[in-house]
Curated annotation (Swiss-Prot):
Top-level taxon of origin: Bacteria
Membership in a protein family: Belongs to the LpxB family.
Protein name: Lipid-A-disaccharide synthase
EC number: 2.4.1.182
Enzymatic reactions: a lipid X + a UDP-2-N,3-O-bis[(3R)-3-hydroxyacyl]-alpha-D-glucosamine = a lipid A disaccharide + UDP + H(+)
Function statement: Condensation of UDP-2,3-diacylglucosamine and 2,3-diacylglucosamine-1-phosphate to form lipid A disaccharide, a precursor of lipid A, a phosphorylated glycolipid that anchors the lipopolysaccharide to the outer membrane of the cell.
Keywords: Glycosyltransferase, Lipid A biosynthesis, Lipid biosynthesis, Lipid metabolism, Transferase
GO CC entries: membrane
A single GO BP: lipid A biosynthetic process
Pathway(s) the chain acts in: Bacterial outer membrane biogenesis; LPS lipid A biosynthesis
GO molecular function ontology, one term from the record: lipid-A-disaccharide synthase activity
Length: 386
């Protein structure tokens, strides 16, 4: 529907619960505003959405969790968010509800919206092709249009009777390098080294406590086994303070390693690295776009892992390998995540033929992701629903 046919000043509610969803949601809102400046926005999100003038009805950080078990401690916040957002849907119905990722919460909210006659656009759908496929029917009943971001998802949903459109991956709009390697190193006072290795344990407290100690032990082992200097780069997300890093091993290792904790220039940091060990998640696609050789790891609570094994029906857990349809990067899962194994794999990426092979595979994955412009395409889909 074009702007002339839409009611001027329509409100759109945008709901997301992850840091990555906040970024993708902000890019979508920005694209919507460029196409129709009269639109207003409310919803649940974080600082990126807030910076665009979105009325934040509930701070997404309060319900951001990792793993099945960890959800229980956040139930009061989840119910509070549900109550506030459902009340807003009823008392001031938006022209459109846009839900981003966060499937269990968002599908609950979508049910309320549909009951009120509010159209629902699901941008960045859950990975139902991997696990909990029973949600496919629920998604169809509670949404009107899907904007999918992985190449194979459009056909997957359409074969099951869903209105789905592939818009491309939004990371292609985000990932850009503004500083050269030399400029980045100079800016952050990082001295010369033979190799630079990235330690990316995730952006949540649970991930960091589960992975950072072993990342640091692996770094020490790697440095001890190599005759040349290695510098380690540790990006810190806005959701994490330095004290949490110190409590999870940094205090012990910061004097034993040449390690640099950096809170900005995220993509420049990644591009600077000769190899990276990263927690499974969106960051692996960012690294793939930058074509940085990586080792991907995942560890959760024993109960969450046990439940996940019963539900997940895929060969790989990293997005890079799932998109490629084969093993491009090595994956370490649960008890496989040890300092010894990490150091061995990183050494192979740095000094063996494996680094070249992984780089070639990542170029293929980068190409499979398509072209930039996901936010603009998603905005067109959203506006067609109002």
């Amino acid at each position: 529907m074009d702007k002339q046919k839409r009611e001027t000043g329509s409100e759109i509610m945008v709901v997301t619960g992850e840091a990555s969803g906040d970024i993708h949601g902000a890019n979508l809102v920005r694209a919507l505003k460029e196409k129709d400046s009269s639109l207003s926005f409310s919803g649940m999100g974080g600082p990126e959405l807030a910076s665009l003038g979105v009325e934040i009805l509930y701070d997404a950080k309060k319900i951001s969790v990792v793993g099945l078990v960890e959800v229980f401690s956040h139930l009061p916040s989840i119910f509070a968010a549900k109550k506030i957002l459902q009340r807003r849907l009823k008392n001031k119905p938006p022209a459109l509800l846009i839900i981003i990722d966060l499937p269990d919460f968002n599908l609950m909210l979508a049910k309320k919206a549909k009951a009120l006659g509010i159209p629902v656009f699901y941008y960045i759908t859950p990975q139902v092709w991997a696990w909990r496929s029973g949600r496919i029917k629920t998604i169809g009943e509670r949404t009107d249009q899907l904007g999918v971001i992985l190449p194979f998802e459009e056909e997957f949903f359409r074969q099951r009777g869903q209105a789905a459109s592939y818009v491309g991956h939004p990371l292609l709009d985000n990932v850009s390098i503004k500083l050269s390697r030399e400029e980045f190193l100079t800016k952050h006072r990082i001295g010369p080294a033979a190799k630079y290795v990235g330690l990316l344990p995730g952006s949540r407290e649970k991930e960091i406590s589960a992975l950072l100690p072993d990342f640091l032990r692996a770094a020490k082992r790697l440095q001890d086994e190599c005759s040349e200097k290695i510098s380690f780069l540790l990006p810190i997300a806005a959701t994490i303070d330095r004290e949490q890093l110190l409590e999870n091993g940094l205090a012990e290792y910061q004097d034993l390693l040449d390690i640099h904790v950096i809170s900005e220039d995220r993509y420049e940091l990644m591009a600077c690295c000769d190899a990276v060990v990263a927690a499974s998640g969106t960051v692996t696609l960012e690294l793939a776009i930058l074509e940085v050789p990586m080792l991907v790891v995942y560890r959760t609570s024993p109960i969450s892992y046990w439940v996940g094994r019963k539900l997940v029906k895929i060969e790989f857990f990293s997005l890079v390998n799932l998109i490629a349809g084969r093993e491009v990067v090595t994956e370490l899962l649960q008890d496989e995540v040890t300092p010894e194994r990490i150091s061995i794999e990183i050494k192979e990426l740095l000094y063996g033929a494996k680094g070249v092979a992984v780089g070639k595979g990542l170029r293929e994955v980068h190409g499979l992701l398509g072209e930039a412009g996901a936010s603009a395409k998603a905005a067109d889909l959203a506006l067609s629903m109002i």
